[in-house]
C-alpha cells in the first residue's frame, strides 16, 4: 500500500477514533453478545445477530484505521520551506474569477475532507488544480459543470 498523506490533526482524529473503538465500543459489543447468548437459541436470536454484525463493522473499522495510520505520511506544513506555493496542508484563499466569490480551502487527506467545512481532499479536482501554484496565479479547475477559474489570493501554512 502506498503512503497516505495526512495532517497532524487528521492523524490525531483517527487515533482518537481508534482509541474509542477499542476501549469503549468493542467492550460494549462484547457485553451485548454475552447478554444475547444468555437468551438461549442463537439461531433465532435477533439481538445476538445484530451484536455480531455490529462487531464485524467495529473490527473492520479498527483494521481500516490501523492500516491507514501504519501507512500515513504525516505532514506538518509549518516545518516545510514552502515560499508561498500551494502544497498539501496549506490554507488557500481563492477568488472565482467569474462570480467574484472568495473561498478559503485547506488541502487535507481523504479522511479529513469535509467540503462543508472547506476542507478539500488532496485528490479533489480543486486541490489538484491549486497545488504547485502561487499567489496571483490563476488555476483552471475542470469540473463536471465546466471550467472554473480561481485566482490565488493568499496561501497560509498553519
Curated annotation (Swiss-Prot):
The UniProt entry, under PROSITE patterns, shows: GREAB_1
Task: Give the source's domain of life in one word.
Answer: Bacteria
Q: Which cysteines are joined by disulfide bonds?
A: none
Q: Which GO terms describe its molecular function?
A: DNA binding; RNA polymerase binding
Query: According to its UniProt record, what is one Pfam family this protein matches?
Result: GreA_GreB
Keyword DNA-binding carried by entry? yes
Name the keywords, alphabetized: DNA-binding, Transcription, Transcription regulation
Which GO biological process annotations does it have?
DNA-templated transcription elongation; regulation of DNA-templated transcription elongation
Q: Does the keyword Cell membrane apply?
A: no
InterPro entries in the record, alphabetically? GreA/GreB_C_sf (IPR036953), TF_GreA/GreB_CS (IPR018151), Tscrpt_elong_fac_GreA (IPR006359), Tscrpt_elong_fac_GreA/B (IPR028624), Tscrpt_elong_fac_GreA/B_C (IPR001437), Tscrpt_elong_fac_GreA/B_fam (IPR023459), Tscrpt_elong_fac_GreA/B_N (IPR022691), Tscrpt_elong_fac_GreA/B_N_sf (IPR036805)
Q: What's the family?
A: Belongs to the GreA/GreB family.
Q: What function does the entry list?
A: Necessary for efficient RNA polymerase transcription elongation past template-encoded arresting sites. The arresting sites in DNA have the property of trapping a certain fraction of elongating RNA polymerases that pass through, resulting in locked ternary complexes. Cleavage of the nascent transcript by cleavage factors such as GreA or GreB allows the resumption of elongation from the new 3'terminus. GreA releases sequences of 2 to 3 nucleotides.
- State what protein this is by name: Transcription elongation factor GreA
Gene designation per UniProt: greA
Amino acid at each position: 500500500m502506498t503512503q497516505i498523506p495526512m495532517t497532524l490533526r487528521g492523524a490525531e482524529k483517527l487515533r482518537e477514533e481508534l482509541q474509542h473503538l477499542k476501549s469503549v465500543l468493542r467492550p460494549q459489543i462484547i457485553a451485548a453478545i454475552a447478554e444475547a447468548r444468555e437468551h438461549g437459541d442463537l439461531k433465532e436470536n435477533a439481538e445476538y445477530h445484530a451484536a455480531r454484525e455490529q462487531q464485524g463493522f467495529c473490527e473492520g473499522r479498527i483494521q481500516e484505521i490501523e492500516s491507514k495510520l501504519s501507512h500515513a505520511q504525516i505532514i506538518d506544513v509549518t516545518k516545510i520551506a514552502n515560499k508561498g506555493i500551494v502544497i498539501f496542508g496549506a490554507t488557500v484563499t481563492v477568488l472565482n474569477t467569474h462570480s467574484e466569490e472568495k473561498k478559503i480551502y485547506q488541502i487535507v487527506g481523504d479522511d479529513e475532507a469535509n467540503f462543508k467545512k472547506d476542507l478539500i481532499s488532496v485528490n479533489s479536482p480543486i486541490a489538484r488544480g491549486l497545488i504547485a501554484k502561487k499567489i496571483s496565479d490563476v488555476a483552471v479547475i475542470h469540473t463536471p459543470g465546466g471550467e472554473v477559474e480561481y485566482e490565488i489570493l493568499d496561501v497560509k501554512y498553519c
